[in-house]
């Protein structure tokens, strides 16, 4: 298990939103960065409206990377990433992370999704079998990895 370091308390707070048709990061109401990526778009175009197989997952990763990589230059360092998104809160629930979801926990869930995608047979009983949930997990994993964010703070709606 690797150590997870919380950002300093005075680190800028950035809200992550992943919507059906688009996403965004916000430092404030006036300062936003649009992410050209939507969960339903990913589900429809890459997952073909079902849980992803290995190829769909790989294609989804490529699409997500292209969409999120430019945001890395916009993000302040260090950063406190936060979210109120229902799907991201549900990912945290599955990971048993009530207040803070770590990159390590996200990676563990993604590994389960990848194993499920690579094999035939019954689905992983821990993972919700909803394509939008899988898309949100994929996007969150790629964001945390490429933006080098160790945790995301969860705020109830």
Language-model regions, residue ranges each:
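Short glycine-aspartate micro-motif
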Residues: 13-17
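Helical "lid/coupling" subdomains associated with nucleotide-phosphate turnover
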Residues: 2-11, 27-157
